[in-house]
Regions:
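Alpha-helix boundary/capping and short turn/kink residues
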Residues: 23-26, 45-48, 95
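Secondary-structure boundary/capping signal
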Residues: 25, 37, 66-69
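Short, low-complexity N-terminal intrinsically disordered segments enriched in polar/charged residues
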Residues: 1-35
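A beta-strand edge to alpha-helix "cap/lid" segment located at domain peripheries
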Residues: 2-5, 55-130
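A short gly/proline-enriched turn/hairpin at secondary-structure junctions
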Residues: 38-48, 60-64
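Acidic side chains
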Residues: 22-25, 41, 78, 107
Length: 130
C-alpha cells in the first residue's frame, strides 16, 4: 500500500514526467525514475532496463524530435498497488522530416518509494522509444 495520495500519482505523471518530456528537461524526467527502473514499449517488446538505459532512450527521443506534446489525459490511479494508468494523445515533430505525427497511447506506471519503478508503454503507431 502506498503512503502517497491519489493526486501524487497524477502529479508525477503529468506535471513532472510528461512535462519534462515535452520540454526536453532530462533532469526533470529522470528525477521521476527509481534507480532500478525499467521501461518497456509493449507493441515491439522493447525493454530499457535500468536508469542509464532509460536515460539513453530519452537522449535519442529528444535528439530525433523538435517538438513533443502529451495531452488529453485520462488517469486511473490504484494507490493500493502503487500504480497509475494514463491514456493520452501524443504529437511529435521529426527533426529530420519536419513531419507531425499523432499517436494515442496508454502507459501503466508502477511506483516504488515515490518514484517510477516500471512503466509499460502502449503506442498506436511506430515505436518512438527505441
Amino acid at each position: 500500500m502506498s503512503d502517497q495520495p491519489y493526486e501524487y500519482y497524477v502529479d508525477i505523471v503529468t506535471k513532472r514526467y510528461f512535462h519534462g518530456i515535452d520540454n526536453g528537461d532530462m533532469e526533470l524526467v529522470m528525477g521521476c525514475f527509481h534507480p532500478h527502473a525499467s521501461l518497456r514499449e509493449m507493441s515491439s517488446n522493447t525493454l530499457h532496463d535500468g536508469y542509464d538505459a532509460i536515460r539513453e532512450m530519452f537522449v535519442g527521443l529528444f535528439a530525433a524530435h523538435s517538438r513533443i506534446w502529451h495531452g488529453n489525459f485520462v488517469h486511473t490511479a490504484d494507490t493500493l498497488e502503487c500504480a497509475i494508468c494514463s491514456q493520452f494523445s501524443v504529437e511529435v515533430t521529426s527533426i529530420k522530416t519536419h513531419q507531425l505525427v499523432r499517436y494515442e497511447s496508454c502507459n501503466r506506471f508502477y511506483l516504488e518509494d515515490g518514484k517510477i519503478r516500471s512503466v509499460f508503454v502502449y503506442l498506436s503507431g511506430e515505436n518512438l522509444l527505441k
